[in-house]
Amino acid sequence: GKNACILHYGENNNIVQAGDLILMDFGVEYANYAADLSRTIPVSGKFSPRQKEVYNACLRIQKAGIELFNTSLSLIEYNAEIGKITESELIQLGLLDKIAVKNQNPNAPLYKKYFMHGAGHFLGIDVHDVGPRYEKIQYGNLFTIEPGIYIPAENIGIRIEDNIHVTPEGNVNLMHDIPVTVEEIEDIMLGS
C-alpha cells in the first residue's frame, strides 16, 4: 500500500488489503557481519498489471546494476549510471517525459522523484557499512544493489535488494536462491 513508498516505515499499524504491496526490507547478522535484503510481494498473491510493469522495470534496473557494478567505477559513478538506466525505465512507464529528462538540471535529476535513495551501499560489520564513495570499487567489496521505484499517487512502492560480492571472476549474488521474479513470487504466494 501507500506505506511502501516510505523508505523505512516503522509504524506497521495498517491492515493490508487485496491489491496492496508489502515491501519487506530485512537482514541478518552472522559472525558479526550483516546482510540486507528487500523484496516486494502482492498481498493478494498476484501483481496487478501496473504493479507487474513497475516491478519488472525495477528488476531490469537491478539486473543491469549487478552487471554494471565493477572495479572500473566509483560508487558515485555507479550511481550516476544507474540514474540513467532508471530514467529510461521511468520514461517507458510514463512517469517521466523524454524531453524533460533531456533538459533537466543535472544537479536535480527528475528520476529522484521516484527513486530517492542511492543504488546500494557497502555491507560489512554494519548493514550500512562505511566505504569510499569516490574511490574505485575493489575486489572483495560486499555491496547491496537495491533500486526502487516509488509512486505514491498509485500506492506502488517497489524495492528489490540483493547482496553482491565483487570478485575477479565476476559479481556473485549472495541472494541468488531467493525468489525475485514476478513468476517466482506469485508461485510462492499462490502455493504453486
Over which residues does each language-model region extend?
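Active-site neighborhoods and metal-handling regions in enzymes and metal-associated proteins
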Residues: 1-192
